[in-house]
Amino acid sequence: LHRRAPTEAEAGALSALDIALWDIAGKHFGVPVYQLLGGKVRDRCRVYYHVFGETRKELVDGVKDAKAQGFTAVGHLTPFLDEERDVPYFKTHAEKITEAIDAVRLYREAVGNEVDLCIEVHRRLTPAEAVQLGLGIEKYHPYFFEDPVTPDNFDEMAYVADKINIPIATGERYTSLWEFEMALSRNAVQYVRPDVCLVGGISGSKKIAALAEARHVGVVPHNPLSPVSTAACLQIAACIPNFALQEYPIGEDRAPKSDMVTGIAQHDGQGYLVLSDRPGIGVELKPNAAKKAPMKPREVTTRLHADGSVVDQ
């Protein structure tokens, strides 16, 4: 496991162990983990807030609501709308690209330049499509263009990065330091997105941040999971000089999540999470937390093209 890229299952298990060990060490010494990593270089961490919606209006309203709450960046923000799973997908190339460009225009007009837009494509484009869309939305100045193509071909991601003037963000599906090195060495990424729960925990994330720092590349930790994951991410964000933004899911500080965890990071109303000085990663599970969040089976589905083939997304 040390010298090869583990599967996501192995990587997730190893990452959980690493986070737990850092948490134990911090609590043993009575200090936050970021102190064990060299000390903090900032007092608070800027975040981007999730925006979801099934219609264009819902997405625009979500962007406006995030701004009203004080957030200065929004993400998980797609320029595409997904049809129902049982409806075969078909749009002409012109429809797909022009509608996506217009969506980004609406998001920008909704909040002006006071909020950064983190555009998420979820790997659904070919390199040629990604370049065309990227060129079309450049004038709206997105903070980054995330996973425009599948991340398994580093050369094609580099091709897209070279053809457009928007920073590329990628890495949420990588499980090893070496995958990040392959992307960085090709100038395929301007913001790396290590997932602390996949890349070897806090230890692995710190290594990736240092690798990116050598190339003046920013770090935007991937974080769609829970307040525990957020707490681990903040330990890294606190102490690395090239931290850029922290992904911040909706409802972190509200029930049901707040019913299960104490010490949850708080939004300061200005787009930042305030760093805690609590020992370890700063959070504790409440009694019976596991019983309040039992495992739920998740249906794996896929969308079909109008010709019956599977949508590669």
Region annotations inferred by a language model:
Residues 1-29, 312-313:
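Metal- or metallocofactor-binding catalytic centers and their adjacent structured scaffolds
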Residues 4, 135, 141-144, 150-279:
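Shared catalytic-loop signature of beta/alpha-barrel
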Residues 17, 30, 74, 120, ...:
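Conserved, mostly hydrophobic/aromatic
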Residues 26-27, 31-44, 265, 273:
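N-terminal amphipathic alpha-helix/helix-capping segment at the start of soluble metabolic enzymes
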Residues 28, 46, 50, 54-57, ...:
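Ligand-binding pocket scaffold of soluble enzyme catalytic domains
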Residues 32, 46, 116, 167, ...:
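Proline-centered loop/turn at the N-terminus of a beta-strand
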Residues 44-45, 50-163:
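Metal-dependent enolase-superfamily TIM-barrel catalytic cores that perform enediolate-based chemistry
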Residues 281-313:
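Extended hydrophobic packing segments that form well-structured cores
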